[in-house]
Amino acid sequence: RDCLLSRGLGDVYKRQVIGGVVGLFCLFGAGLIIPQNQKDAIPALQILAPTIFLSGILGVFRGYFQAYRNMMPTSISQIIEQVFNAAVSLLAAWGFINAFSDGTENSIAKWGAAGSTVGTGAGVVTALAFMLLVYGVNRRKILHRVEKDHRHQEESYKEIFRVIILVVSPIILSAFVYNVNAYINGYLFSDILGRRGGDAAQIGILYAEYATYFMTIINIPLTLSSTAPTSMIPEVSALYATGDIEATRECIDQTVQLSMVVSAPCAMGLAVLAQPIVFLLYGNSTGLAANLLILGSFSILLNGMSNISNGVLQAIGQQRIPVITAAIALVVDIVVVVVLLFTTNLGVYALLIAMVIYSVVVCVLNDRAMKKYLQYKNPWKEGYLYPILASVPMGIVAGCICYGLNIFVKSNFICLIVSIPVAAVVYLFAYLIISKPSESQLRRIPGGSYLIRIAEKLPFWQNN
């Protein structure tokens, strides 16, 4: 079956013609897709059209390596994609507004959205280039595997699509529920505040601080932390299939620790450095996005927990459970948003509260399911407490350096570029002191071999 994947790779490319047709339809038929009252969104969809086609090819490469339990290329490509997405979106939106906007509010929104979609395409193109490089490096091994394949059994496309639909549909539904949550909240926010007499322009500015500024920044560490559960799925699935529940639980523990080692310092860093980060990236921000980051950065931990639990349940064949929990969380989210917006003056903070509650509901329900099927208990001390404690001195050092330096150097960029590397070193030392990880634990962290060489030179570190 492994070799069948190698032979089938070429056949999959032929099916990309479907993606090409859809992309062309979005390019030339955008006016038919976009509602009459949203014609300003047409340029954004047209710019996005090539990305639809390229995303399919990128998915083929990622899926190929994932099938061989090699998750590193996929994980790295996801990080690269998000970084380029965020950076190019900002630059392209600024460039499009200056080049094509006539200065009116609608025109700025129209061309800003169009420019932002360039970032999506840039992220996909960069990730695809990386995957092509990885494929090129491994090409000889792949061809050698194909040449030695004499025992595979061809499967019809009907059978392949049947399996894909059965396995992937619940995962897609779960992702759909999660993503539609943002659209529903945006609609409720605008509609309810409008009914309460809010100014339309002011409502738009408030929502932009949340959806465009806050969420764009926070999605970068969320992508970093989501690579761990993605890479875990094949191994957990294989261990569970053999009936080795103890090894399955150990694999999940390792994933939790890896995810939190990344998520905890990101959350602390964004909370402490929220203001300089926001004003560096979005100079026209009112400052609301910085406040949202300070209050909502810990949601990175909650989202990391929910991503891991979703991945585990999907890996053990319980794909329907994440769909159900996401649907329940969506209902709770909607109720919270409606109640808070109608009964309080929290404004956009109501969306932040609802986002946190959504993640908590998913975590609690998924945790119950994991206890039922795996008798699993979260490693609260090793997985969560140690990284959080190590993040505290890191945050103190980062804040002191950044805000102290800002007294003399009025440049957010310089202050951040100096404080972040120093804070990272402090976090590494603090984590080694508090957690006392073994060599095998360090090796699982990205750049683990380099971390081991550093740790071996420290008098307080011992390889357990």
Language-model region placement:
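Hydrophobic transmembrane helix module of multi-pass membrane transport proteins
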Residues: 22-180
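Membrane-interface junctions at transmembrane-helix termini in multi-pass inner-membrane proteins
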Residues: 55-78, 298-328
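Single conserved hydrophobic/aromatic residue that forms the stacking wall/gate
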Residues: 2-16
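Membrane-interface helix-loop junctions in multi-pass transport and translocation proteins
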Residues: 72, 83-129, 133-134, 320, ...
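Membrane-proximal transmembrane or re-entrant/amphipathic helices at the cytosolic face
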Residues: 400-464
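Helix-loop junctions and terminal segments of transmembrane helices
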Residues: 1, 222-244, 256
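Transmembrane helical elements of multi-pass membrane transporters/channels
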Residues: 120-123, 127, 131, 135, ...
